[in-house]
Amino acid sequence: MATVLGSPRAPAFFFSSSSLRAAPAPTAVALPAAKVGIMGRSASSRRRLRAQATYNVKLITPEGEVELQVPDDVYILDQAEEDGIDLPYSCRAGSCSSCAGKVVSGSVDQSDQSYLDDGQIADGWVLTCHAYPTSDVVIETHKEEELTGA
């Protein structure tokens, strides 16, 4: 009767009453390629790299209030779309005002956007296409005309 002795860090040995020999070396196994997302990493790999928080996000839309759960590594617009909530957008790159909203309470990280200036951010303006929640947050959506004065 043979028994395998070993640990993940040491080579395994097969032991029997008549011999002690090293186990064959493991062979490489090809794994399926992950789907690559924004920034060259898959969403699942980004989530595995660190602990993840999920925040309550309340969106005040012209049709009424909607609440959703948004992980801290997902843009608010992306999660809203995944949950079937229709929000305005255009460039999805943080370089226009189509998805503009106003933070009523809470906080977001929108350091990836390039459209809003520091004063607008301090006044509570947010681009939902490039905003991660950093706390529970309430946002008034559909605010492009108010932001641009159009």
From Swiss-Prot:
Similarity comment: Belongs to the 2Fe2S plant-type ferredoxin family.
NCBIfam families hit by this protein: fdx_plant
Record function comment: Ferredoxins are iron-sulfur proteins that transfer electrons in a wide variety of metabolic reactions. Occupies a key position both for transferring the photoreducing power to Fd-NADP(+) oxidoreductase (FNR), hence the formation of NADPH, and for mediating the cyclic electron flow around photosystem I (PSI).
Organism encoding this protein: Zea mays (Maize)
Any one cellular-component term (Gene Ontology): chloroplast stroma
The protein, known as: Ferredoxin-1, chloroplastic
Tissue expression per record: Expressed almost exclusively in mesophyll cells.
GO MF annotation terms: 2 iron, 2 sulfur cluster binding; electron transfer activity; metal ion binding
Database matches in InterPro entries: 2Fe-2S_ferredoxin-like_sf, 2Fe-2S_ferredoxin-type, 2Fe2S_fd_BS, Beta-grasp_dom_sf, Fd_pln
